[in-house]
From Swiss-Prot:
Protein name: Targeting protein for Xklp2-B
Statement: the UniProt record of this protein carries the keyword Hydrolase: no
Subunit comment: Associates with microtubules. Interacts with aurka and plk1. Interacts with kif15.
Phosphoserine, modified sites: 204
Statement: the UniProt record of this protein carries the keyword Cell cycle: yes
Keywords carried by this UniProt record: Cell cycle, Cell division, Cytoplasm, Cytoskeleton, Microtubule, Mitosis, Nucleus, Phosphoprotein
Intracellular or extracellular location(s): Nucleus; Cytoplasm, Cytoskeleton, Spindle; Cytoplasm, Cytoskeleton, Spindle pole
Function: Spindle assembly factor. Required for normal assembly of mitotic spindles. Mediates the binding kif15 and aurka to spindle microtubules. Required for targeting kif15 to microtubule minus ends. Activates aurka by promoting its autophosphorylation and protects the phosphorylated residue against dephosphorylation.
Annotated Polar residues bias: 47-56, 141-152
PTM text: Phosphorylated during mitosis. Hyperphosphorylated upon assembly of microtubules.
Length: 715
């Protein structure tokens, strides 16, 4: 950061006039100068003016480096002229001439390196392993005064690009130190620390010995400025020892990019390589000791014999003792001892029968079995046909229809419709004698009480009439006497006799015997009924013995295996043959000549374009600054666009918020107005109805008349 004097400037023409190619007649003068300079030996060559200018420009203050607008315009026009000359001459140069120019440029590079070794480097050379840098050549800058005003104008040369010092750090690891030097430095630092600690201890001893009552003032040391030490500077691995030979080396730039930088600490030591064996089969795990083989049967037996650890009592004394200091003695042979089991004293009754007992039981069963022969049926000897009884012919099943409830309901409806009305026949009844004696059927007229007139007291309090409670007459219950019972047969209750149930002995032997006899009789009847008829079979004819044909089995016939791989191979072969046929067909079709329409006549003629390449583009080792775009400018544009988008989004958001706020205010205003209208009480006018006009009835009063049922009242 301290190298603020190294500045970076680059002036490139913004407008290039291509018409100057044809106007310039001295375009090839630069190549003539280069060819003349090749004849001068390298020892007698003076320093180039560009190197002198570089030295002068490096010493100039940074404030004076910035050129004026006129100088920049002159320099741009000058660069345009030089570029036009190089571009025109590049077309006429041969290969030999180009090689000479390359050699010349390499020599100029070496001269610049030697001339500028005293000053701090500016740019890393492309393809070289050294870390030397060059100061930029500032165009249009006037030379220093001590060279004189009459000095000739320096010729325009190619500008060498250099990175700005802002993007670089100081070359801290210019020289790598060996391990011995590093150890010595560490020892010196430790010695210094020891000396400082001794001084502090002596000072504290003096203070302690001198008066302890007075307070000692702490001495605060002055802060010392310490330079910044970045960790990234230590990571930079640069080759401090430059290789021997100052020759210019051509290196492929693409391959160097991927190549890791050589570390300065690693120094290759001479000597033969010591071969070491490869431990390929060695595992990471520790070697496990091989245990004795135990079969699964033995493991199972041991598991069942072994008492689980949870049943063992743990003694605290043994746990506290720890491992025994005495060495374990060799194990001796075990003396077998009887376990003194208690199972011999236990005797349980055996429930299982022995083989002898089972055999004796079987013999008894055989002796008890008696063979009972059946009686001979006489009908067999008679030779009559003993036919089985014909089974009784059963009546054929009669189909019975389903009695569905819906059919019953339909039939009932039909029956109701079919019911005819009964013929009404008039039968006269005798006339009751009460009609002739008195009026019958008409109730007597009740006499109403006389109405007492009263004033209609509308304004009085007691105008509301209290309904008179009618006294209900209590109905006198009619007592009806019950009928007298019939005392013809007197009731005599029967006394319950006390009986004692006596248990009598009983047995089912007689009943079982009777049932057994009935069963035997029934079986005899069945046997007599179903006597089989004897039918003798014919004797076989031994004249001709007809044996069945011997079935001769066919031997197994071998068939080839039908493998899936053969099928796949066959399908693949067919596909391949089909593909070959199609390819041959396409080739034959392509061989057949078919003339295409002539479209070249109607197209525009080909016009070769001029090459806009410069001489330096064709040279492999040349370095020309191409147009570039700084990342800061790109980020600034992106940031500007992002801020613009943010501002638009904020504006939209504010508009939406304003609209919602206005809408909310309008809704609140409407609600308040509506509430006001609802809360204000408005008196309604008294309604006026038509007066009630009571009209007198026009119907005359009913005149009561007695019903004249009989003819005696008639005139």
């Amino acid at each position: 950061m301290a190298d603020a004097q190294d500045t970076y400037s680059y002036d490139a023409p913004s407008i290039f006039n291509f018409s100057s190619f044809h106007d310039d007649h001295n375009a090839d003068s630069w190549f003539d100068q280069l060819t003349n300079a090749e004849n001068i030996p390298p020892d007698q060559k003076p320093l180039s003016e560009t190197s002198v200018n570089a030295e002068q420009n490096c010493k100039v203050e940074p404030g004076k480096i910035t050129p004026s607008k006129e100088e920049v315009s002159k320099s741009t026009t000058h660069v345009c002229d030089v570029k036009s000359q190089t571009k025109r001459s590049a077309r006429r140069m041969s290969k030999k001439h180009r090689q000479k120019i390359l050699l010349k440029m390499k020599e100029t590079h070496l001269e610049k390196e030697t001339a500028q070794s005293e000053y701090p480097p500016c740019k890393k050379l492309k393809g070289s392993s050294t870390k030397d840098r060059q100061a930029p050549v500032i165009r249009g800058q006037p030379t220093s005064s001590h060279h004189g005003t009459t000095s000739p104008k320096p010729k325009a040369q190619l500008t060498m690009p250099a990175t700005p010092t802002v993007l670089k750090r100081r070359n801290i690891l210019a020289k790598s130190k060996s391990s011995e030097e590093q150890e010595l430095e560490k020892m010196q630092a430790l010695q210094k620390e020891m000396l400082e600690n001794l001084k502090k201890n002596e000072h504290s001893m003096k203070v302690a010995i001198s008066g302890a009552g007075q307070p000692v003032k702490n001495f605060i040391p002055v802060t010392k400025p310490v330079d910044f030490h970045f960790k990234t500077d230590d990571r930079l691995k640069r080759n401090a020892n430059p290789p021997e030979g100052d020759g210019y080396k051509e290196v492929d730039f693409a391959s160097v990019l991927r190549k890791p930088p050589t570390s300065p600490v690693q120094v290759t030591k001479g000597g033969h390589t010591v071969p070491k064996p490869f431990n390929l089969s060695k595992g990471k795990r520790k070697h496990e000791e091989a245990s004795d083989f135990v079969s699964t049967a033995e493991q199972v037996v041991a598991f069942y014999r072994r008492t689980p650890a949870r049943y063992h009592l743990r003694s605290r004394q043994k746990e506290m003792e720890g491992p025994s200091p005495v060495k374990m003695l060799k194990p001796k042979l075990t003396n077998p001892k009887t376990p003194l089991l208690q199972t011999k004293q236990r005797h349980r009754p055996t429930t299982c029968k022995s083989a002898a007992e089972l055999e004796a039981e079987e013999l008894d069963m055989i002796h008890q079995y008696k063979f009972k022969a059946q009686e001979l049926d006489t009908r067999i000897l008679e030779g009559g046909p003993v036919l089985p009884k014909k089974p009784s012919v059963k009546e054929p099943t009669k189909a019975i229809g389903f009695d569905l409830e819906i059919e019953k309901r339909i039939q009932q409806r039909e029956k109701k419709d079919e019911v005819e009305e009964e013929a009404f026949s008039f039968h006269s009844r005798p006339c009751p004698s009460k009609i002739l004696a008195d009026v019958v059927g008409v109730p007597q007229k009740k006499l109403l009480p006389v109405t007492v007139p009263q004033s209609p007291a509308f304004a009085l309090k007691n105008r509301v009439r209290i309904p008179a409670q009618e006294e209900k007459e209590e109905e006198v219950p009619v007592i009806k006497a019950t009928r007298m019972p019939h005392y013809g047969v007197p009731f005599k209750p029967k006394l319950v006799e006390q009986k004692q149930v006596e248990a009598c002995p009983f047995s089912f032997c007689e009943r079982d015997k009777e049932r057994q006899l009935q069963k035997e009789k029934r079986l005899d009847e069945l046997r007599k009924e179903e006597v089989p008829k004897f039918k003798a079979q014919r004797l076989p004819q031994f004249d001709h013995i007809s044996l069945p044909e011997k079935k001769v089995k066919m031997p197994t016939q071998q068939e080839p295996f039908q493998l899936e791989i053969d099928k796949r191979g066959a399908t693949k072969l067919q596909r391949w043959q089909h593909q070959i046929k199609e390819e041959l067909k396409q080739q034959k079709e392509m061989v057949v000549f078919k003339a295409r329409p002539n479209t070249v006549v109607h197209q525009e003629p080909f016009v070769p374009k001029k090459e806009s390449r410069s001489l330096t583009d064709s040279l492999s080792g040349s370095m020309i600054q191409e147009g570039f775009e700084l990342a800061t400018a790109k980020r600034a544009k992106e940031r500007q666009e992002f801020e613009k988008c943010l501002a638009e989004m904020e504006a939209q958001k504010s508009l939406l918020e304003e609209e919602t706020r206005k809408q909310r205010e309008e809704e609140e205003r409407e609600e308040i107005n509506q509430l006001r209208q609802e809360l204000v009480h408005k008196a309604q006018p008294i309604r006026k109805f038509k007066a009630v006009e009571v009209k007198a009835s026009d119907v005359p009063l009913t005149v009561p008349a007695s019903p004249n049922f009989s003819d005696r009242f008639k005139c």
